[in-house]
Amino acid sequence: MSALIEKHPFKPFLPPGCKVVLCGTFPPKPEKWSMDFFYPNFYNDMWRIFGMIFLGDKEIFFDRDKKRIDKEAIQKLLNSEKIGIGETVTEAIRTRDNASDKYLEVVKMVNLPELLSKIPDCNHFVTTGEKAAKVIASLTSTLVPEVGSKTECEIKMENGIIKKFYHWRMPSTSRAYPMKLEKKAEFYRHMFEEIGII
């Protein structure tokens, strides 16, 4: 029996005037979702970090009783701050029945020129984990940045123009990543400050 190739379930969310796009690898299986949007697992810390940084409340997007995440409120914030969300992997095989990047076999990577052509004001690409960072480093023939740092990259666009952008590597927002929520939030806050979002 051949391995099942899965397509990424979400299309990139790219607000008009998007200045930065955050990209991970692959979401968990649908039975683990608390909404149908990026970082859908109730126990992933991405939207807690956003709540802390932008609204001063890490639980503002979470309904603990219903185990739901407020997608509409998140998208409203992303639109307001001109922050995009996408992926580095568009097709993958789960070699084990979980969401760990360790057991994710990349089949197809994001088409960077195509993605960046949709967001001409964006000069910052943020990866939210080691595997995502390695994908972008591979696509741009650059070194993988250290956590919290950035690398300058160049990519040849579909029209032949060379576009420069910065690849930032942030800590994974998975609970399995050994770093306290507050420390993760410090990395993300610094990155948003450097970019000029906050």
Label each residue range with its predicted role.
Residues 16-17, 121:
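Short, well-ordered loop/turn elements at secondary-structure boundaries
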